[in-house]
């Protein structure tokens, strides 16, 4: 064993290839441990300690020290002062596991020749890994983390016990050319994902987010933010000062502020907005935008988009593509909300029927969740009650209320439900589904292959429904679902034949053997029906 002792000045010391003990004493010393398993103490002063081979124990002592492990393990103590640990494993091809919080790393994870790295009292960490599949978790220090060509995961290890703050400081992360996952929920100063297809999870606290080459996905979680921010992926910036580039797919969760989000050239945008007055412009891909109860302007752009609003006086425009637009408010506020499906076959769903809706080009569907107001609806008028104006709607999904309703639609494949009361349903042309509900209902399918539906929740064990134009040759069906076969005592075509009676008006089918609970098919004879015309589900 060789012992090397410095002076009170600034020394340059080197160990041998054997096991050494090296003391730098005072002064700003530069010490290279050499070969062997060495013990190195920098002493007072701003020292530079380097280990290149063997398993060395390095102590910086007092002062702001720089301690480097080059391709090897070791045990490091920073000592007093602001100390930096550099771990350079760029030439290591095996997997690395590294936890800044626990002060521990493993080189050659799951191999027979693994080595440990232990460290404590370190204020700044600079870590570079090689081509293995690495798992790197930062510490509460200011870290610079660069990974190599493997499929790596970089992120915070956990949270502290008091306030839930992630155990990362002001960091820089560079993951190299692998398909990496960067999970930094506090926000590193700089994130560089490098080549390949990467996933970045962070906040708007980051100064630079660069996905690099490849197909990169960015998730921004800032649900607690209420100050209102702008994120423009097309221009590559956020109003927080964050620069964003190299991102193909983005997901953004924001808080209750009035926020602006512009997709730009993104292939896909997913946005969860709060209750502020938000503006979101989607891109050319399939976007998903959900907003709260503020007065929002949501534009899907090209692609098959989904737009969701919880309420408010909104502008919801799907743009090109087969879009889905959902408005969840119980009313359209002051009537200022405007919904435009744009080109494509769109679905527009509203809870309460009020406002202005333009389906745009294509074959568009209007679905009203709540029962219709009033008792009469005729699609040809372009109005629904006194509060909804619509145009360019080809298909309707509507239900009546508890009164005696009259619902008439046009040429689309409509779904109409009468609910309670003695209702009149007319589907017009198209392949319609008509549900009479309770009461004495009159149903007209119109041209097309129509389905007349009975289910377990439409019976009050009373009422005779009438179908005015049942045409088996035209593809019309009688459909019994749920517990309807049990309720009607008809669960096969043979049962239907046994319950049928030909009258001067047509064919009457008695449900449960009753004269006041059944179905009348106008101008239909029993011979006109076959088992193919009745479906039991």
Task: Give the label of every model feature segment.
Residues 10-14, 19-97, 101-104, 133-242, ...:
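Acidic, glycine-rich calcium-binding repeat modules characteristic of RTX/beta-roll
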Residues 103-112, 116-118, 164, 236-243, ...:
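Generic recognition of long tandem-repeat/solenoid scaffolds
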Residues 110-113, 185, 240, 255, ...:
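Short strand-coil-strand connectors
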Residues 3, 108, 219-220, 243, ...:
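Intrinsic low-complexity/IDR segments
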Residues 1-16, 126-128, 251-253, 261-263, ...:
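Extended, small-residue-rich solenoid/repeat segments and analogous flexible loops
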Residues 1-2, 113-128, 134-137, 248-251, ...:
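Low-complexity acidic/polar repeat-biased segments
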Residues 264, 469-470, 480, 509-511, ...:
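Beta-strand-rich, repetitive solenoid scaffolds
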């Amino acid at each position: 064993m060789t012992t090397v002792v410095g002076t009170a000045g600034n020394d340059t010391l080197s160990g041998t290839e054997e096991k050494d003990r090296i003391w730098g004493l005072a002064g700003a010393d530069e010490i290279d441990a050499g070969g062997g398993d060495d013990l190195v103490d920098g002493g007072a002063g701003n020292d530079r300690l380097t280990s290149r081979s063997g398993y060395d124990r390095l102590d910086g002592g007092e002062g702001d020290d720089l301690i480097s492990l080059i391709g090897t393990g070791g045990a490091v103590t920073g000592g007093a002062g602001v100390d930096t640990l550099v771990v350079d494993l760029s030439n290591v091809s095996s997997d690395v596991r590294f936890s800044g919080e626990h002060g521990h790393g493993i080189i050659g994870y799951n191999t027979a020749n693994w080595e440990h790295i232990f460290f404590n009292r370190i204020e700044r960490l600079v870590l570079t890994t090689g081509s293995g599949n690495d798992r790197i978790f930062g510490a509460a220090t200011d870290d610079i983390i660069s990974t190599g060509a493997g499929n790596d995961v970089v992120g915070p290890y956990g949270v502290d016990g008091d306030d839930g703050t992630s155990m990362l400081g002001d960091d820089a992360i560079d993951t190299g050319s692998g398909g990496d996952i960067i999970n930094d929920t506090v926000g590193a100063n700089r994130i560089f994902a490098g080549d390949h297809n990467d996933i970045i999870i962070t906040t708007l606290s980051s100064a630079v987010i660069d996905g690099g080459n490849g197909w990169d996905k960015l998730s921004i979680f800032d649900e607690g933010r209420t100050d209102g921010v702008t994120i423009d992926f097309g221009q590559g910036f956020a109003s927080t000062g964050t620069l964003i580039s190299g991102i193909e797919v983005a997901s953004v969760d924001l808080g209750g502020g009035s926020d602006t989000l512009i997709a730009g050239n993104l292939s896909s945008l997913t946005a969860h907005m709060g209750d502020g007055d938000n503006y979101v412009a989607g891109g050319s891909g399939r976007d998903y935008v959900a907003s709260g109860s503020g007065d929002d302007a949501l534009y899907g752009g090209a692609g098959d988009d989904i737009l969701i609003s919880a309420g408010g006086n909104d502008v919801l425009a799907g743009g090109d593509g087969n879009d889905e637009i959902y408005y969840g408010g119980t009313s359209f506020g002051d009537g200022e909300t405007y919904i435009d499906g744009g080109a494509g076959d769109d679905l527009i769903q509203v809870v309460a029927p009020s406002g202005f809706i333009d389906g745009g080009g294509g074959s568009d569907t209007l679905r009203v969740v709540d029962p219709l107001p009033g008792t009469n609806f005729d699609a040809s008028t372009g109005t629904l009650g006194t509060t909804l104006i619509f145009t360019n709607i080809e298909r309707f999904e509507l239900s009546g209320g508890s009164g005696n309703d009259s619902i008439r639609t046009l040429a689309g494949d409509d779904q109409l439900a009468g609910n309670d009361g003695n209702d009149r349903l007319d589907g017009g042309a198209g392949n319609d589904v008509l549900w009479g509900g309770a009461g004495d209902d009159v149903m007209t399918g119109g041209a097309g292959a129509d389905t007349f539906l009975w289910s377990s929740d439409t019976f009050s064990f009373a009422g005779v429904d009438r179908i005015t134009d049942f045409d088996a040759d035209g593809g019309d069906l009688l459909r019994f679902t749920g517990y309807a076969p049990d309720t009607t005592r008809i669960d096969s075509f043979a049962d239907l034949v046994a319950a049928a009676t030909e009258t001067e008006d047509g064919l009457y089918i008695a449900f449960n053997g009753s004269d006041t609970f059944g179905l009348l098919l106008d101008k239909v004879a029993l011979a006109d029906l076959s088992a193919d015309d009745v479906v039991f589900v």
